[in-house]
Structures are given as C-alpha cells and as structure tokens.
Design a protein with these regions (language model features):
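Helix-loop boundary and gating motifs at the non-cytosolic
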Residues: 23-65, 257-268
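Cytoplasmic membrane-interface "Motif A"-like loop-to-helix N-cap segments
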Residues: 88-98, 303-317
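Symmetry-related core transmembrane helices of the 12-TM Major Facilitator Superfamily/SLC fold
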Residues: 184-199, 409-425
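Helix-to-loop junctions at the C-terminal end of transmembrane segments
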Residues: 78-90, 294-307
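Cytoplasmic helix-loop-helix junction between adjacent transmembrane helices
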Residues: 123-160
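Juxtamembrane intracellular "pre-TM" segments in multi-pass secondary transporters
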Residues: 7-26, 205-246, 442-445
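C-terminal transmembrane helical hairpin of 12-TM major facilitator-type secondary transporters
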Residues: 309-358
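Residue-level signature of mid-helix packing/kink "hotspots" within the transmembrane helices
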Residues: 72-80, 164-165, 288-296, 390
Length: 445
C-alpha cells in the first residue's frame, strides 16, 4: 500500500487521475475518509441516544420518531442545494462547515431538551448532515479514476461501517454509564476533528475544470458536425427515470434502518430490562459491522463484474428478512439469551443487506448519470436515503404508537418487498439504458 499522508495536495488533472493505480495514491482520499469517519461517528453516536432519551424523559414514541424525521427532513432539503454550494465554495469548506453543524449544536441538549429546542437543533444538525453526505459521496468519484470507483466506494463503506461499529455501542454505553453530558461532548469532539481533516481535501484544480470544459465543448462540436448522427442517436432519458430504481432501493432499505435505529432499543426495554442495554448497544453495532461487510462485498463485486446492480436484489432480500425476524422476535417477546440471539441475528442479516444496497444504489447512479452530474448523483442518493430514514421514522413511529413495535418492522418489510419487485423487474426488462454521456463502467484495475 502506498504511503498515506495528510499533507494538503493539489487536485489532479484528468490525465494525471487516469495514471493512478491505487485508490490510496489519490490526493485527499485519506483526509476524506477521516472526515467521513468523524461525521458518521458523531451522527451514529446520537442516533439511538436521542430517541431513547426522549422516551425516558416522558416523551412519546411519536415525538421520538419526529425528532429523527425532522433531522432527516432538514438533511434532504440541504442535500438539494449542496451541489451548488460545492461549486461555489469547494469541497473542503462544505465538509468542514457541515461537520461543525452536525456535532456542536447537540451541546444545547445539555441545557434544554424541550420539544421546540429538540426539533430546532435537529434542523441545524440535519443541515450539516445533508451537506456532508452529498460531499463525501461525490468525492469518492471525484478523487479516483472511474475504474477504481468500486474500491473507493468500498473504502468509504469501511470508514462509515467502522464509525458505526464503534459509535452505536459507545453512545448508549456513555448514556447509561456517565449520562448525557459525556455523549454530547464526544459528539462535539467528533465534529471538531472531522472538520479539521476536511481542510486537507484538495480543491478541484483549474486544470481538471478545463479538461471537463474541453470534453463538453468537443462533445457539443461533434454533435453539431453530423446532424444525421444526432438524429439517429437515442434521446437521453430524464434524470428521474435513470435514478428511480436505485433511489427506490436505497429509500426502502433506509426505512428499515429507521425501524432498527429508532425502535429496537425501546422495544427490547419493554421485553427484558436485564439484557436491554446489551442488545441496544451491541445489536446496532452488529448491524453496523455487517453493513460495512456488505459495502465491501458490493464494491469488490462491482470491480470484478464491471457493472453495478447485480447484488441489489439480494441486499433487499436480506433487509426484508431481518425486518421480518425482528418483528417476530418482538411479538414473541422471549427473554434472556433467546432475545439477545434473535436480536443480533435480525440486526446482522438486515445490516448485510443494508450495506449491499447502499453501495449498489450509489454506483448504479454514478453509472447511469453523465460524468458532469457526479454531485447530482450523490445528492439524489443521499436525498432518497435520508427521505426513507426520515419519513420512515415518522410513519413507523405513528404505527408503533397506535399498534405495537413489531408493526413498525413489518410495515418496513412491506415497503422493502415492493422495492425488491421493482429492482427485479428492472434487471429483467431494463437492461438498455439511455444516457446523455457515454462512459465506461467501473472495471477491475
């Protein structure tokens, strides 16, 4: 492996980028991974803690779900204009500022966690999360040649997975052992470190922008030079058509993630308090670890096949299975070791599918959209992901309040089943893609 340095390096031109033989030689990738690790570490740290704290302080399941939903709503709205923001101020400023917004406002919860403050801080943190998620997903395509994108996406998945593997149990352990002050302080530390690392991410070089402008000019001239070829060429499909299937897949699996992250902890507390802390902490850690494995598998498989999407259906199937098992487990309400084993199994199976679908959907969007729409592809992936998480948390919270926790998991499984049917249909009858800019798919390098 090439030596890794955090020293600031200029971005590479297109020609220089194509000479890279390893993702670890890409300037700025390691700094990006550190920033991503801290962003997702801080987010994951508080993800199960805030809903659980709301319920422990007398709030309803609906309010707990609403806090997640408002966070994700702000996230999605921010993601819509993040590509523009990146063009204006660059990746380093976006990543650094977003990291601060994601972590530091949570310190206000030490003073006040009333509903207005709870939801107001959720909006601020959601804005930070929205910007950082779009930027980091786009960077894995910007910093490496397209043939190595499977490896860079696997590296990104590893950073996210390790962050979740550590932070899921850490947040709940800190809450139970030391109280809220420790949890929110650690989230603030994550924010500061991640923001500092972001300043070592290179700006896109002028040479790179000139290369892209030249390619666009050449393509325009070529189309103008031969009207017959233009007439015979396929009309590019609308962006929403190209993005619909991967967007539905990630949105559906994210709804299932909302069920696990928001309602697993209170559900097991209602069944057996003696093992609730273990399941709440380690169960989500198992989910994060298997998610990391799924993203690595999907990235490597795409590198070998040269095309993304082959494992999307399998991933959704695993996610559906995990949700159904979790619902059955909560309905049967076993205690002790059976409850622990069942929760770990359900979380692990879901996590594997979650990771597979995450990676497949992102690479499918990068493949289907033109090169100049890399940040748009990243924004669409993140918007559908976080819409699924946010809307899922709200709707499943209503279901949990009106019926029972298991209903939330089963409803999420039904949504996943619909997405699976669409993905299968897409693989069978949707092989031919109409795209505006031809480009090679990721291939083994």
């Amino acid at each position: 492996m090439a030596s890794i340095s955090l020293s600031r390096q200029p971005a590479l031109s297109t020609a220089e980028l194509e000479q890279i033989t390893s993702v670890w030689k890409a300037p700025g990738l390691f700094a990006t991974l550190i920033s991503v690790f801290c962003a997702f570490g801080g987010w994951t740290l508080l993800l199960p803690v805030i809903p659980l704290t709301v319920i422990q302080h007398g709030g309803s399941e609906s309010l707990a779900g609403l806090s997640t939903g408002v966070f994700m709503g702000a996230t999605v709205l921010t993601q819509a204009f993040t590509p523009w923001l990146i063009r204006v101020v660059g990746y380093p400023a976006v990543m650094a500022g977003a990291g601060i917004m994601l972590g530091l406002p949570a310190l206000v919860y030490l003073v006040d966690m009333s509903p207005p403050v709870l939801l107001g801080i959720a909006v601020l943190r959601g804005m930070g999360f929205g910007a950082v998620t779009v930027a980091e997903s786009a960077l894995i395509a910007e910093l490496v040649p397209r043939r190595l994108m499977g490896n860079s996406s696997a590296a990104l998945g590893t950073a996210v997975g390790v962050a979740q593997l550590i932070s899921f149990p850490l947040g709940l352990w800190l809450l139970n052992s030391h109280g809220q002050a420790w949890v929110f302080s650690v989230a603030a530390i994550y924010a500061v470190v991640g923001s500092a690392a972001a300043w070592w991410i290179p700006y896109q070089s002028k040479a790179r922008k000139a290369d892209q402008d030249a390619l666009l000019a050449d393509a325009t001239a070529a189309r103008s030079a031969d009207n017959l070829e233009v007439s015979a060429a396929p009309i590019p499909a609308a962006t929403w058509k190209l993005a619909a299937v991967p967007g539905l897949a990630i949105g559906a699996i994210a709804t299932g993630f909302a069920a696990f992250s928001t309602f697993l902890a209170p559900a097991v507390e209602a069944i057996d308090l003696t093992v609730a802390a273990l399941i709440s902490a380690a169960g989500l850690s198992v989910l994060g670890g298997m998610q990391m494995l799924g993203r690595i598998i999907a990235g490597r498989y795409t590198m070998k096949r040269g095309e993304a999407g082959h494992l999307a259906g399998i991933g959704l199937g695993c996610g559906i299975t995990g949700l159904i098992l979790a619902g059955i487990l909560i309905a049967l309400a076993p205690v002790g070791i059976p409850l622990v084993a069942g929760a770990f199994a359900a979380a692990g199976i879901f996590g594997l599918g979650f990771g597979l679908v995450q990676n497949e959907a992102l690479l499918m969007l990068f493949e289907r959209l033109p090169n100049e729409k890399t940040t748009l592809a990243s924004a669409l992936w993140n918007m559908t992901f976080d819409s699924g998480t946010g809307i899922g948390a709200i709707l499943l919270g209503i279901a949990a309040s009106a019926f029972a926790f298991q209903q939330a998991f089963w409803i999420a499984a039904c949504i996943g089943t619909f997405a699976l049917c669409v993905v299968i249909a897409d693989r069978v009858v949707g092989r031919r893609r109409l795209r505006g800019t031809a480009k090679p798919a990721p291939a083994a390098g």
